[in-house]
Regions:
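ABC family nucleotide-binding domain
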Residues: 7-222
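Generic detector of short, aliphatic-rich beta-strand segments that form the cores of beta-sheets
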Residues: 224-226
Length: 234
């Protein structure tokens, strides 16, 4: 997918996500308009229930909007079938979750190799890429460790390596420090800062002001709408 500096990687136009629960109708997203350009570093903040995770799920092609338009590097996502969406998730977007979402019985190396199974790569090439990704996050000496042998910060580093191993255009992080203590949180944020500095587009959901302060742009949601969208100094 090609891009130019003036072209938005992500374009959201009048985006809605509506849930019907019996007689009740919930607008999780209520007419959202957002553009995000390549190499931006964006925090999405807001109270619980404001629509943050719903927005991330739609951007990450884990959910579909009820109406409105979502374009990913100029391509209408709403027109894609499930196979095309799966390909986007595997190749274009890397995910980091609060709960790590690692395979409990697999080593760090095998966890990071997992997204590459769907690529036309030899096992040796998959292994080499996974080793490189783990070394990038400072875990080159823990390749054979399982999640239960790692600290919370180390598990999140494995999750970040897994997100980056396929060289995606966009990194989505949903409360990446939510389960970590303050010191480990800052270590993880230093790593995410480095990922952004190396050219990655990073979009992060957080409710913590000190974590949002790492980003260059802050979008606050309230009741499914954009309350404000502000730039901030590095």
């Amino acid at each position: 997918m090609a891009d130019t500096p003036s072209h938005a990687v992500i374009e959201l136009r009048d985006l809605y996500r509506i849930y019907e629960m019996g007689d009740q109708v919930l607008h999780a997203l209520d007419g959202v308009d957002i553009d995000i350009h390549r190499n931006e570093y964006v925090a999405v903040i807001g109270a619980s229930g404001s629509g943050k995770s719903t927005l991330m799920n739609i951007i990450g092609c884990l959910d579909r909007a009820s109406r409105g338009e979502y374009r990913l590097e100029g391509t209408p996502v709403g027109d894609m079938n499930e196979t095309e969406l799966a390909r986007i998730r595997n190749r274009e977007i890397g995910f980091v979750f609060q709960s790590f979402n690692l395979l409990g019985r697999a080593s760090a190396l095998k966890n990071v190799m997992q997204p590459l199974v769907y690529r036309k790569l030899s096992r040796s090439e998959r292994r080499a890429r996974a080793v490189e990704a783990l070394e990038r996050v400072g875990l080159g000496d823990r390749l054979d460790s399982r999640p239960n042998q790692l600290s919370g910060g180390q598990r999140q580093r494995v999750a970040i390596a897994r997100a980056l191993v396929g060289k995606p255009a966009i990194l989505l992080a949903d409360e990446p420090t939510g389960n970590l203590d303050s010191q480990t949180s800052q270590e993880i944020m230093a790593l995410i800062d480095q990922v952004h500095d190396e050219g990655q587009t990073v979009i992060m959901v957080t409710h913590e002001p000190d974590i949002a302060a790492h980003c260059r742009r802050v979008i606050r949601l309230d009741d499914g709408r954009v309350e404000y969208d502000r730039r901030q100094a590095a």
